[in-house]
């Protein structure tokens, strides 16, 4: 049975009667039918599941090529995975991620890391790149043949006081972008310059039409632009689609992402799998029951 998302996509394509295929040049990432795309990163990727902006546009751009998308991003995460740790040592975080990679077996992994370095004057950049390489090695070990996409973090914004001027941080992000471009080449990974696509180094002064709520975290309108530019950075073109049809796709994606979030980050996990599972551990068997619901989404 075709999923709800697939049916909505086909209806949308039929409405505007356009067909889109990715070009074969070197600036285009080639998706294959049936690809399993996993998003890995920190807050900018994690919050995408709130807005459902990226996946509908990717689906429209790919046309008949069907790609599933699963969001494994985690707010505050770094390439070392420490934010993912619960009650154990910091290393537990990367072990947790390893288990989720085992579960999903991605054929494509899109990673966006490093924004925190902009606020640290790029201190620790060598260690960051070493950790990034180790993370990619882990992904490749879990999913041999996986294709890697490295995404440069988008810019931050300088807003009205008392919020700080983030001009220096944007210069740091520009330098980080340059380092990530070289890193991606060395890793035989596709590179997306999200920083430049979102405007690059802004002009001096305050943002006149801000896309963030505080200079760092993007608004719903910001995510609309982020999503469109990310698809563009993959070398794909998004066909025109009627607003109601795109909204239907967006709602279907948000529903699917909510189900998946409850699958891999369930509430009260301590009772399900942790040190209190003896109290309610019998409920752990219900977590895999999300899988068929997610597949239909």
PLM regions and their residue ranges:
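Hydrophobic h-region of N-terminal signal peptides that target proteins for export
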Residues: 9-17
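Conserved catalytic region of serine esterases and O-acyltransferases that act on ester linkages
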Residues: 19, 32, 186, 209-297
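Acidic/histidine-rich helix-loop elements
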Residues: 71-92, 119
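Substrate-gating cap/lid alpha-helix
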Residues: 158-194
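Serine-esterase "nucleophile elbow" of acetyl-processing enzymes
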Residues: 17-75, 90, 97-105, 109, ...
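Oxyanion-hole/transition-state-stabilizing segment in secreted/luminal serine hydrolases
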Residues: 40, 50-52, 89-129, 260, ...
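Structural recognition of the beta-strand scaffold that forms the well-ordered cores
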Residues: 36-40, 68-73, 107-113, 147-152, ...
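Sec-dependent signal peptide recognition
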Residues: 1-7
């Amino acid at each position: 049975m075709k999923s709800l998302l697939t049916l909505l996509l086909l209806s949308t394509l039929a409405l505007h009667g356009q067909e889109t295929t990715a070009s074969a040049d070197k600036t285009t990432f080639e998706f294959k039918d049936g690809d399993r795309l996993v998003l890995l990163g920190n807050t900018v990727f994690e919050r995408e599941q709130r807005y459902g902006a990226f996946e509908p546009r990717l689906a429209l751009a790919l046309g008949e090529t069907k790609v599933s998308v699963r969001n494994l991003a985690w707010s505050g995460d770094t390439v070392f995975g420490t934010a993912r740790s619960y009650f154990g040592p910091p290393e537990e975080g990367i072990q947790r991620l390893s288990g989720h990679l085992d579960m999903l077996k991605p054929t494509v992994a899109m990673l966006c890391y490093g924004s925190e370095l902009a606020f640290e004057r790029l201190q620790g950049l060598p260690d960051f790149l070493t950790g990034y390489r180790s993370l990619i090695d882990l992904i490749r070990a879990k999913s041999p043949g996986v294709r890697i996409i490295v995404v440069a973090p988008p810019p931050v914004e300088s807003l009205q006081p008392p919020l700080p001027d983030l001009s220096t941080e944007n210069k740091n992000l520009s330098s980080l972008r340059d380092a990530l471009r070289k890193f991606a080449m060395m890793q035989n990974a596709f590179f997306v310059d999200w920083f430049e696509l979102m405007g690059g180094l802004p002009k001096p002064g305050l943002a006149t039409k801000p896309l963030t709520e505080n200079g760092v975290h993007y608004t719903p309108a910001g995510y609309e632009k982020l999503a469109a530019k990310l698809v563009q950075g993959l070398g794909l073109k998004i066909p025109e689609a009627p607003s109601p049809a795109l909204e239907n796709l967006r709602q279907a994606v948000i529903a699917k992402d909510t189900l998946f979030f409850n699958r891999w980050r369930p509430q009260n996990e301590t009772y399900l799998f942790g040190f209190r599972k003896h109290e309610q551990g019998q409920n752990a068997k219900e977590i895999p029951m999300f899988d068929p619901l997610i597949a239909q989404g």
